[in-house]
């Protein structure tokens, strides 16, 4: 379906729409269970765009990499090449390319603010104990700054600009423990609106392969990944991201007896959603 990797979510969404692979949900849906219930009818295997979620102006897209065929196509390869392509990217990484301006800097919002004033935070199951952010890519750096960690984390929304963060990575747990010993928070960024290839790059093991995940991601996409420096933390994030939350992670404030670290955002950076090239 593609002649090369797609790095921009809006372009990929339009490509799926042009190929009649995108399902449009035009009626208003609720962020309380309903959106996820509709998506689950397809098993997450069908690209979907929800045009009216509660009263938010921005649409919500799901399922862009829900099958091996979709994932491979977004990177310009065949599904049968996925393993070989990933192995080659791990062994032949491409260092990211730093840019000074990016779409995710079109609109900058500083605390105090509430995340759910700008985009929906979903309740996924009826019996969930709250609303969760689940599709954001966490970005952090090793203590010496030599490696970038990226991963998909589930975050329980606490209201305003606070959320919990579940960390299962051994290296990051150890890093958090060192920050706790020195009473210093760990700088992080949470990134939304990424193409499937970037998400795939976040899933390899940094510990096993001793790799910088953003460099592996560049190899997956066939060219160095454009990254832009954050405004309030010393990190770089994908320049084509739709939403970037910058913040700091605090250990030792678990909530509801769940082993989660506490995360407090300091700045939310959002693009101009109204100028996005989504199908009408």
Feature roles, as predicted:
Residues 1-280:
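Extended, highly charged
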């Amino acid at each position: 379906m593609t002649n090369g990797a797609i790095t921009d979510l809006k372009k990929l969404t339009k490509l799926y729409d042009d190929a009649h692979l995108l399902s449009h949900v035009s009626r208003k849906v609720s962020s309380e269970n309903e959106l996820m219930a509709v998506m689950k009818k397809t098993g997450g295997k069908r690209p979907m765009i929800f045009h009216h979620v509660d009263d938010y102006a921005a649409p919500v897209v799901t399922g862009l990499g829900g099958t091996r065929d979709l994932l491979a196509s977004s990177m310009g390869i065949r599904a049968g090449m996925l393993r070989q392509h990933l192995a080659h990217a791990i062994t032949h990484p491409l260092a990211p390319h730093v840019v000074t301006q990016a779409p995710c800097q079109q609109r900058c919002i500083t605390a105090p603010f509430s995340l759910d004033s700008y985009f929906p935070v979903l309740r996924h199951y009826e019996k969930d104990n709250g609303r969760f952010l689940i599709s954001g890519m966490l970005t952090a750096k090793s203590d010496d700054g030599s490696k970038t960690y990226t991963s998909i984390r589930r975050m329980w929304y606490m209201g305003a600009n606070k959320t919990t963060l579940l960390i299962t990575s051994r290296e990051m747990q150890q890093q958090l423990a060192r920050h706790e010993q020195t009473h210093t928070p760990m700088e992080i960024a949470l990134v939304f609106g990424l193409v499937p290839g970037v998400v795939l790059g976040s899933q390899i093991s940094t510990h096993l392969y001793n790799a910088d995940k953003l460099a592996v991601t560049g190899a997956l996409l066939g060219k160095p990944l454009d990254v832009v420096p954050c405004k309030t933390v010393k990190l770089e994030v994908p320049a084509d991201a739709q939403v970037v939350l910058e913040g700091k992670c605090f250990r030792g404030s678990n909530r509801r007896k769940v082993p989660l670290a506490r995360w407090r955002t300091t700045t939310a950076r959002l693009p101009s959603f109204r100028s996005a090239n989504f199908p009408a």
